[in-house]
Amino acid sequence: MNKARIPIALQQAVMRCLREKLQLARQHFSVEFPEPKILYQQRGTSAGTAWLQAWEIRLNPVLLMENQQPFIDEVVPHELAHLLVFRQFGRVPPHGNEWRWMMESVLQVSASRTHQFEIASVQSKTYPYRCGCQLHQLTVRRHNRVMRGESEYRCRQCGDKLKFFAGEPV
């Protein structure tokens, strides 16, 4: 696998944002939250994930390199908010009222559930399948399950079994 190398200046910008937002939370709650570990291991189209028990944030290195400051301004506080909400409120819905409040009132960032970054460079290939009414795109994982005879998929509209349409992934 080709790993994206994150320039030290970009890693420092990530940490600067993390520490600024963490300081806002510390001041607001009068609690000394530990600094979460940052890993650049997130794959696929997700910009980042918060690992609650491990107290770590995993960031997508490709999307970070392609979007830099907008990524830092949006994704780092988003994932930090998940950790802080877990620490303060326990298990609650991931983008619920507590998370929204943490983003807007404590971290002073607008609460957005999803990123709007271009994902062409990190998007998986898909395979075309047909039913009676339309063309579907199955992921590599689902396609392989069909090929091995482990799964079959049906159209939600017409109910027909999906059939592999062509040899080339899209």
Curated annotation (Swiss-Prot):
Record-level GO cellular component terms: cytoplasm
InterPro entries: SprT-like_domain (IPR006640), SprT_Zn_ribbon (IPR035240), Uncharacterised_SprT (IPR023483)
Keyword Disulfide bond: no
Subcellular location: Cytoplasm
Residue ranges of domain SprT-like in the record: 23-164
Cofactor(s) this protein requires: Zn(2+)
Alphabetical keyword list: Cytoplasm, Metal-binding, Zinc
Domain of life: Bacteria
Major site of localization recorded for this protein: cytoplasm
Pfam family, one: Zn_ribbon_SprT
GO biological process: response to stress
Active site: E79
GO MF: zinc ion binding
Stretches assigned to coiled coil: none
Zinc in keyword set: yes
Binding residues for Zn(2+): H78, H82
Cofactor note: Binds 1 zinc ion.
Family the UniProt entry places it in: Belongs to the SprT family.
Protein's UniProt name: Protein SprT
Biological source species: Serratia proteamaculans (strain 568)
